[in-house]
Every structure is written in C-alpha cells, then in structure tokens.
C-alpha cells in the first residue's frame, strides 16, 4: 500500500510520518506470491488497510470481503490488491500532495496513529487502523453522521478478519498522540468520517470536538 503514492516519510518521537517528502517510484511491482512467506499475524495486519478501502467507494470490495474474508480465502488476494491499488492510484492522481481528496486515505489513521504511538508501536499498524476506524465510526453514530446498522456491519467485517475493534489504551492517551498527527494544524485537525457503509467524508474540526468522538 505505501509503495503506491510517492510518499517517503519517517517516524519521529512525536508521532508517525511527521517528516517526509514526495518522490514517485519508477516502477511498483506487486507480486502476491511473496505474501506466502508472511505469518498469519501479518496477513491480518494488512487486512486493516484493505477494509479501509471498502469505505472509500471501491465498488464491490465490501461485498467481496463479507462473502470471502481474506483470512479464509487467500486465493482472492490478487483481485483485492488490484482493486485497492487502483483505488489509491486514482485518488493520488487527483491530489498527489494531499491538499484535498487524498486525505480520505487516512480513514482510521487519526486514532490509529494515536494508538500506535501510545502503545510504543506494540500495536501493529493494520490492527491500529481497524480500531481507529471502529472508534471513528462509533463517534460518527453519536454525532448522527452514521447509522447503527452500518457500524454493526463494519464491526462484523473487522472481526471476520480477526482484527480488534477495541483498545485498552485510554482516551486521553489517544487524543494526546492525535494532536501531533500530520493532519493537525494549530487548534484544528482534518478527520475522515464514515457517513454510510462504504463511504467516508472529510471534515475539519477542533481538537476539543475530536474528543467528543471518543466520549
């Protein structure tokens, strides 16, 4: 996933991906056969990002994942990779430097990065993104932006891929880390909110308002 889009970034003590640049690769080679060398934990880890794409208007992806969870149907990985890579490429072509629509790719990452940092990166990225999506979706329900049925379907899908939906990390720790997120500017932060099953939207809110998504 990170090979497509041209971002080159490093993690700092204050948070993830805070220092970087844009450099498009000459070639991206996707060889699904190499995934056979991965332990189950890393397969599950990758599914967090894949489920994210299902909420970015990728036609048919959620239905495919519902009927054939990747954990049990690994033979479908090539089709899934193709859909996700094409979706990201389409978004990046519209907004290479992330001044607009590309920020949608951060669904689940605001709270997810906070969880990673607060856990001292013991929680792997895909696991954190899954929890981050769930927390944001729960907040969206509280704010009247998402219906409960969509939230429950997301929860079922995440669990079907053996990913977590909750964390023992405190709200205060997550928010403290989120304030240093690269999408944070001054007193505001740009978040990605799921507004229906399969669709998400960008929203700029204050840090105080962000806290209400975790209440």
What are these regions (language model features)?
Residues 1-68:
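A glycine/threonine-rich phosphate-anchoring loop and its flanking beta-alpha core
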Residues 6, 23-26, 101, 187-188, ...:
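A generic structural signal for well-ordered coil/turn residues at beta-strand boundaries
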Residues 35, 53-54, 121, 143, ...:
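Histidine kinase transmitter module recognition
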Residues 48-51, 145-215:
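C-terminal charged capping/lid subdomain of soluble metabolic enzymes
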Residues 63-172:
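Active-site segments that bind and position negatively charged phosphate/pyrophosphate groups
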């Amino acid at each position: 996933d990170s090979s497509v889009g041209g971002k080159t970034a490093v993690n700092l003590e204050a948070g993830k991906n805070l220092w970087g640049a844009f450099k498009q690769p000459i070639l991206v080679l996707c060889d699904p056969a190499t995934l056979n060398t991965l332990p189950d934990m890393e397969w599950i880890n990758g599914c967090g990002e894949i489920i994210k794409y299902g909420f970015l208007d990728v036609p048919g992806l959620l239905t495919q994942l519902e009927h054939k969870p990747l954990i049990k149907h690994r033979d479908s990985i090539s089709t899934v990779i193709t859909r996700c890579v094409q979706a990201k490429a389409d978004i990046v072509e519209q907004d290479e430097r992330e001044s607009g629509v590309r920020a949608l790719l951060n669904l689940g990452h605001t709270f997810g990065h906070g969880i990673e940092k607060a856990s001292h990166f013991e929680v792997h990225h895909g696991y954190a993104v899954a929890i981050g999506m769930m927390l944001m979706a729960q907040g969206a329900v509280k704010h009247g932006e998402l219906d409960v049925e969509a939230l429950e379907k997301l929860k079922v899908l995440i669990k079907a891929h053996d990913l977590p939906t909750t964390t023992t990390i405190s709200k205060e720790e997550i928010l403290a880390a989120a304030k240093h997120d690269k999408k944070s500017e001054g007193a505001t932060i740009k978040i990605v909110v799921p507004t229906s099953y399969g669709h998400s939207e960008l929203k700029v809110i204050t840090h105080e308002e962000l806290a209400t998504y975790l209440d």
